[in-house]
A protein has these predicted regions:
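Canonical tetratricopeptide repeat
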Residues: 74, 108, 143, 177, ...
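Canonical positions in the second alpha-helix
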Residues: 61, 94-95, 128-130, 163-164, ...
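Structural marker of alpha-solenoid helical repeat scaffolds
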Residues: 64-65, 97-99, 132-133, 167, ...
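Start-of-helix register in tetratricopeptide repeats
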Residues: 36, 70, 104, 138-139, ...
Length: 471
């Protein structure tokens, strides 16, 4: 027997069976085992990928139980695990001819077809098994869901996951798979409908409440998300993921102290993780406690040294703390790894603005727009930099470019009007503002937020007053 053998069975009696088999395989003794014992021991060897021992065990098992269906299925599993798909299918097809109405044989054949890439045939076999087996169908539902997912038939895959939950609402794995499927497909409204109905029927199911909260979170319905996560926590007080989700919703609502409390509770339950330390860092950053934020970003990076968001957060904290050169070095290192991250380029632009590296600022903004050309906020920031540097023509050009690229005719046009007006281009300014007002008149106050002195300009006040009177 191998000295470094890693026991699979926890039960002493089962471990003793395995020890006896090891002696038998070493040809030092002969023992008789029941079919179920052979099945368990062969599956153990397959699970730990000791295929040579599995083959030897199968030889002995065949000698002791020559017509056993279970031993034949084990042999098929060995062929599948060693990529001998045709041999596996041949064995199972022979069994199918002998017992055509056996659901286990149909499931085994479906698995063999699935492993060999024959998805449609796998689906048919699993459906055959379903017709033959009317109880304990959850695993077949799951297999059907997987096969339809392979084919890209998301609605069918979702349907079969839902079937699992009809018969087994406590199946946390099925709930997780369904939640992830809704997320991947962007079906957040459908997720809310399903999990609302599910939690009405299963009000004490923590996972159902959690996934409902996650669906609300994706829809940016943060208050309902918090309520759902709180119900999940009532069902299971140490549900770390629910505390995390609640913290995320609170953070998005700007309730930073409460969010921090939720994240810290999750940290106490789950222990350190890069994402938890990052979220805690975010809370402190929004509270302008940059030393503490930096501490947690560094904690996050100790666990995962290339965590993108934490690297950017670290550079930003260094900037806010006045360590501009360190901030620049930090963001430059980040950009070596993540050159396509628009936020990283925007942080660099801000740092370079502060230290007066004008050529680097332009380059950073242009790179940010290359990474995310749909961000109208970046066009606003870039134009603000150019305008404050006295380059009003370039600032207007950037905004016009942004309007064409993003289709945002309100925020960008309001700002373009300000630049034009302050540059003496009154007619052009009014044209920009007319476009913006026709698109979204409610945003007109941002003109005066950016340039408060315009409150004292009678022509501007008259223009906006006349437009309001026409509405």
């Amino acid at each position: 027997m191998d000295q470094d053998f890693n026991p699979f069975f926890d039960d002493p009696e089962e471990q003793e069976l395995l020890n006896r088999l090891e002696i038998m395989l070493a040809e030092k003794a002969y023992y008789f085992f029941d079919v179920s014992d052979w099945e368990d021991m062969i599956q153990h060897y397959l699970q730990v990928q000791q295929f040579t021992k599995a083959r030897k065990a199968l030889v002995h098992a065949r000698q002791q139980h020559p017509v056993s269906r279970e031993i034949s299925l084990c042999e098929a599993d060995l062929f599948l695990d060693t990529h001998r798909y045709k041999d596996a299918i041949a064995i199972i097809k022979k069994m199918e001819r002998e017992t055509p109405n056996d659901p286990e044989v149909q499931r085994a054949l479906g698995t063999a077809y699935s492993r060999s890439g024959r998805t449609y045939e796998a689906i048919q076999c699993f459906k055959n098994a379903l017709n033959m087996q009317h109880e304990d169908s959850g695993e077949i539902y799951f297999q059907l869901s997987c096969e339809y997912a392979v084919l890209g038939k998301d609605a069918a895959a979702t349907y079969w996951i839902q079937k699992i939950l009809e018969t087994d609402p406590e199946n946390a794995g099925a709930l997780y798979d369904l939640g992830m499927r809704y997320d991947a497909e962007g079906l957040f409204d459908e997720a809310v409908r399903f999990f609302e109905t599910f939690t009405e029927k299963n009000p004490l199911n923590q996972d159902g409440w959690y996934h409902l909260g996650n669906a609300y979170l994706n829809l940016e319905n943060f208050k309902d998300a918090i309520h759902a996560f709180e119900y999940a926590i009532v069902c299971h007080e140490e549900f770390s993921a629910a505390w995390y989700g609640k913290g995320e919703a609170l953070l998005r609502l700007g309730q930073h102290h409460d969010a921090l409390e939720s994240f810290n509770t999750s940290l106490e339950i789950e222990g350190p993780s890069p994402h938890l330390h990052f979220e805690i860092g975010q809370c402190y950053e929004f509270m302008n406690e940059f030393n503490k934020a930096l501490h947690h970003y560094n904690k996050s990076l100790e666990i995962e040294s290339d965590f993108e968001d934490a690297l950017i957060g670290k550079a930003w904290c260094l900037y806010e703390m006045g360590h501009f050169q360190n901030a620049l070095e930090s963001i430059d290192k980040t950009l070596v790894m993540y050159a396509k991250n628009a936020d990283a380029w925007l942080v660099k632009a801000e740092i370079c603005r502060k230290i007066g590296q004008a050529s680097e600022v332009d380059d950073a903004y242009e790179n940010a727009l290359l990474c995310d050309g749909e961000s109208w906020e970046t066009y606003l920031d870039y134009s603000d930099y150019l305008f404050t540097e006295g380059n009003s023509e370039a600032a207007l050009f950037i905004l016009e470019r942004g309007i064409l690229q993003t289709g945002n005719d309100s925020d960008l046009a309001y700002r373009a009007g300000v630049y034009a007006y302050l540059s003496g281009k009154t007619e052009s300014a009014f044209n920009f503002w007319l476009v913006a007002l026709s698109e979204d008149p409610e945003k007109a106050p941002q003109v005066f937020d950016y340039a408060p002195n315009l409150y004292k300009d009678s022509r501007v006040l008259t223009f906006f007053g006349d437009f309001k009177n026409e509405l």
